[in-house]
Amino acid sequence: MKRQKRNKDDRAYNRGYNAGLDGKSREDCPFGTLQARTNWMGGWREGRTDFAHGMLGVASIQNLKNIG
């Protein structure tokens, strides 16, 4: 748990990926700093791509980025 809290860039990316995979808008970014927002948007873009390709439910289990 402490290790996850240390790396805020990965955490922002993962939260963005999960938001994109859930089909949420990019306006929902909770981060204000440029670095965290950039990482969140990168994850969101990749999550939206997977969302568009139908990687939902059981199909998204194969993608390890959405775990955590």
Swiss-Prot record:
GO CC annotation: cytoplasm
UniProtKB keywords: Cytoplasm, Translation regulation
Biological process annotations from GO: regulation of translation
Pfam family, one: RMF
Top-level taxonomic group: Bacteria
UniProt subcellular location: Cytoplasm
Keyword match Cytoplasm: yes
Predominant place of localization: cytoplasm
InterPro entries given in the database record: Ribosome_modulation_factor, RMF_sf
NCBIfam families (alphabetical): PRK14563.1, Rmf_CrpP_fam
Role description: During stationary phase, converts 70S ribosomes to an inactive dimeric form (100S ribosomes).
Similarity annotation: Belongs to the ribosome modulation factor family.
Name of this chain's protein: Ribosome modulation factor
Species of the source: Alcanivorax borkumensis (strain ATCC 700651 / DSM 11573 / NCIMB 13689 / SK2)
